Design a protein with these regions (language model features):
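Intrinsically disordered, low-complexity serine/threonine- and proline-rich regulatory segments
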Residues: 1-10, 92
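Short, contiguous hydrophobic alpha-helices characteristic of membrane insertion segments
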Residues: 4-6, 61-62, 113-114
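N-terminal helix-turn-helix DNA-binding core of bacterial DNA-binding proteins
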Residues: 6-49
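Basic amphipathic alpha-helical segments that dock to polyanions
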Residues: 50-57
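Beta-hairpin "wing" of winged helix-turn-helix
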Residues: 58-75, 80
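Basic, amphipathic "hinge/linker" alpha-helix immediately C-terminal to the N-terminal HTH DNA-binding motif
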Residues: 74-93
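Amphipathic alpha-helical dimerization/coiled-coil segments
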Residues: 87-114
Length: 114
């Protein structure tokens, strides 16, 4: 059985935004499970992490929410990406691409790819 690790600091917002971009509206539990699945079940997203992140993203205007009914007929808050959220995804992806390129220089010395 694989050991799960907590989501890396500073990455959850991007993972949430990219999940909503790819999947469309989802409730918090669905977002958390999708992030875990996408990571190959290497990452663990708990309620104490996902819901504060969703609240912050909503306050920033990157996502919006509305109440709906889940697959098991329970009331659930569904989150969707806003126009501002789509622009933020682009910005964050560019930043992570730069960060990844920089880290690659440290992990593979001698390979200058920037």
């Amino acid at each position: 059985m694989k050991n799960k690790t907590d989501v890396w600091q500073g990455t959850l917002a991007l993972m949430v935004l990219k999940t909503l971009e790819a999947m469309g509206p989802l409730h918090g539990y669905g977002i958390a499970r999708r992030i875990e699945q996408t990571s190959g079940n290497h990452l663990s997203v708990n309620y104490g992490t996902i819901y504060p992140a969703l609240l912050k993203l909503e306050q920033e205007g990157y996502i919006a929410s509305e109440w709906g009914v889940s697959d098991n007929n329970r009331r659930a808050k569904y989150y969707r990406l806003t126009r501002a959220g789509r622009k933020q995804v682009e910005r964050e992806v560019q930043e992570w691409e730069k960060t990844t390129a920089i880290l690659t220089r440290f992990l593979s010395p001698g390979k200058e790819s920037l």
